[in-house]
Amino acid sequence: MARKFFVGGNFKMNGSLESMKTIIEGLNTTKLNVGDVETVIFPQNMYLITTRQQVKKDIGVGAQNVFDKKNGAYTGENSAQSLIDAGITYTLTGHSERRTIFKESDEFVADKTKFALEQGLTVVACIGETLAEREANETINVVVRQLNAIADKVQNWSKIVIAYEPVWAIGTGKTATPEQAQEVHAEIRKWATNKLGASVAEGLRVIYGGSVNGGNCKEFLKFHDIDGFLVGGASLKPEFHNIVNVHSL
């Protein structure tokens, strides 16, 4: 089964009305290989609706966070139904900044992932280890623990993309080598085969996130288990276009 390449741009808490206009104009006017590469941007909440209205339709728009309840007294949270109502069809869950800064547990991330899927969103579920965990040779144990938490609550994996993002390589300028990324991605695929079945594992997209930029993205293409990228800072710049078009660089 051919897995469609996936490139996501996580804008984090960056951007202004003016800069978003520039970013959207660039996406709309640049020839991007969106037919072969599923391309999704994740702006701040403030700009979700205007982005969806203004960016071309073959580019997806997603939220950076979602809650695990339909509605109610949950000040500051995103409702999956409200996102869908606004034309937003993707969300991130479990980003390392949510796990570390906001203390989101594996179980909470799994609950949010489950609920978002049930409401009809496509979920990019983020997993990854800290530098201390990598140095203690705990990388695989950590990502398997995080994956098991999701698998305990989710049966249908057809609308999940797994983003492996080593925490030590996010916003630091450090990047896992393509070989390091492939090693973990292969272990994720092996886990999926054993836990979810061979056909689910073969169709599951596992993308890499961690200081990906226009200069290093092509190096990852030679590895079969790397199905795309979750891009941070570079997604705010024109080089994001090169990452989307990585196959023709």
Swiss-Prot record:
Superkingdom classification of source: Eukaryota
Pathway linked to the protein: Carbohydrate biosynthesis; gluconeogenesis; Carbohydrate degradation; glycolysis; D-glyceraldehyde 3-phosphate from glycerone phosphate: step 1/1
Database matches in Pfam families: TIM (PF00121)
GO cellular component: cytosol
PROSITE patterns: TIM_1 (PS00171), TIM_2 (PS51440)
Modified positions (Phosphoserine) in chain numbering: S105, S199
EC number(s) on file: 5.3.1.1
Gene Ontology terms for molecular function: triose-phosphate isomerase activity
The protein, known as: Triosephosphate isomerase
Record lineage: Eukaryota, Fungi, Dikarya, Ascomycota, Taphrinomycotina
